[in-house]
């Protein structure tokens, strides 16, 4: 497992500083309204939350959220811009500081596609460990068809996993989805197109 991630953290700190304002979210979680409402009384775990777009979406709708990231700048941005937020420093490359069988719902939005095979497997096992029986992970990852955001660009280090100059990124096909997310349990997946305000979004 590659644990030398100082450069990766620095990159995300810089990215978060450039976007240290109230985050702008899209409405992808609207599709999962029933799942969210069934967790109205539970704390939702926002894994790799960045500056808190999904955190803001959830808090505005009355949900209790723990926002987790390994960028202190991202966590600071959440604390500064989202009232009633709770944050936790968490490095996904290490064991999560969470007890087994804690969460009924975990959200990992565009945060699981930056890691090599070994690390990705580790992360999926950790997610499985902290999920309760019949718990749910809602996640979005980059697709092999995501050509606007780097699919197939750079040095291919592993199948569908590229070094793009400043960082690494994995682009998933359905085989990858089943390989990795299947570690957690049964998988439901679809490929969709995201709509973003490009003024609010910067790579990676």
Segments and roles (model prediction):
Residues 96-106:
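A short acidic, Gly/Pro-enriched loop at the edge of an enzyme's catalytic core
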Residues 121-133:
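A short glycine-rich, Lys/Arg-flanked "PGG" loop and its adjoining helix->strand segment in the class I
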Residues 104-119:
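A short SAM/SAH-binding and catalytic strip from SAM-dependent methyltransferases
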Residues 46:
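Class I SAM-dependent methyltransferase core
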Residues 97-99, 116, 173:
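GHKL-family ATP-binding catalytic core of two-component histidine kinases
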Residues 1-40, 50-95, 122, 138-204:
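Class I (Rossmann-like) S-adenosyl-L-methionine-dependent methyltransferase catalytic domain
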């Amino acid at each position: 497992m590659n644990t030398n991630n100082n450069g990766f953290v620095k990159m995300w700190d810089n990215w978060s500083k450039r976007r240290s304002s109230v985050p702008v979210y899209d409405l992808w979680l609207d599709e999962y309204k029933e799942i969210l409402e069934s967790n109205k009384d539970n704390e939702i775990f926002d894994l790799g939350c960045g500056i808190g777009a999904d955190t803001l979406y959830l808090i505005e709708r009355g949900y209790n959220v723990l926002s987790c990231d390994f960028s202190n700048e991202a966590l600071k941005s959440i604390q500064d811009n989202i009232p009633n937020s709770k944050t936790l420093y968490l490095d996904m490359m290490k064991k999560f500081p969470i007890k087994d069988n804690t969460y009924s719902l975990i959200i990992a939005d565009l945060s699981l596609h930056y890691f090599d095979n070994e690390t990705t497997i580790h992360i999926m096992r950790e997610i499985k460990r902290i999920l309760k029986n019949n718990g749910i992970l809602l996640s979005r990852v980059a697709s092999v068809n995501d050509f606007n955001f780097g699919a197939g660009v750079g040095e291919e280090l592993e199948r569908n996993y590229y070094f793009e100059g400043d960082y690494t990124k994995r682009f998933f096909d359905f085989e990858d989805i089943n390989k990795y997310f299947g570690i957690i349990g049964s998988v439901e997946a679809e490929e969709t197109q995201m709509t973003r305000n490009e003024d609010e979004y910067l790579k990676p």
